[in-house]
Amino acid sequence: NDPEVPGMWFGPRL
C-alpha cells in the first residue's frame, strides 16, 4: 500500500 511504489502496492507492504 505504498503510493510511491506502485509495483509494491500488493507486495510486502500490503
From Swiss-Prot:
One of its GO terms (molecular function) is neuropeptide hormone activity. The lineage of its organism: Eukaryota, Metazoa, Ecdysozoa, Arthropoda, Hexapoda. Keywords: Amidation, Neuropeptide, Secreted. Belongs to the pyrokinin family. It comes from Periplaneta australasiae. GO terms for cellular component: extracellular region. This is Pyrokinin-6. Myoactive. The keyword Cell inner membrane does not apply. Expressed in the brain, subesophageal ganglion and in the retrocerebral complex (mainly corpora cardiaca).
